[in-house]
Amino acid sequence: MCPHCGFSADGGQQPNALPFRTRLQNRYLVGAAKKSNGEGFVYIGYDAVLNIPVELHEFFPQSLCERAEDQKSARVMGGSEIAFDENLAAFLNHSREVARIRELSAIVQIYDIFEENHTAYTVSEWDDSITLRYFVERSGGNLEWNEARPLFMPVLSALSAMHSAGVSHLGISPETLRIMKDGK
């Protein structure tokens, strides 16, 4: 068990995810894949320079690519090259736009964006949080307005600021909204 981030290799890694302890940029150590979606994987990771846990987002749309023999690189499936390249460019552009918005506490801060292994990654602050879906389920399936209001007002303010800056967030859902340990 990692004393810095709580990572444990006991549970095994998700299929097609990067192997445990893969090193990226000779700096970031890959831990467990916390989730996957149509865009790729989200891992718990460790920044060996700053000695802090981080969250690593890997662009790896499994409908367009697969792991190469080295178990690290993305290999684009035949006929999917244009779609992969367009989506990769969109991932990088959106990540750069979000990284420029640093003054909003309701948005996870992006520390680094890079390309490696024929794909791209973002590195952001690690937050020990739960999804809104889990929070609501744990609360009996409902939230009263006096409970929901302090959770959603920062989100609405952040969305307003993002849209004013020309940045869209197209993936808002109970799975992507997260509640921190302090209840924010």
Where are the regions a protein language model picked out?
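AlphaC helix of the eukaryotic protein kinase fold
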Residues: 70-100
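Catalytic-loop of the protein kinase fold
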Residues: 159, 163-180
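Conserved short submotifs of the Hanks-type protein kinase catalytic core
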Residues: 117-131
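AlphaC helix of the protein kinase catalytic domain
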Residues: 132-143
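Activation-segment/catalytic-loop signature of the eukaryotic protein kinase fold
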Residues: 112-113
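Conserved N-lobe loop of protein kinases adjacent to the ATP-binding glycine-rich P-loop
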Residues: 46-53, 60-65
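Protein kinase glycine-rich loop
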Residues: 31-37
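Activation segment signature within eukaryotic-like protein kinase domains
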Residues: 151-152
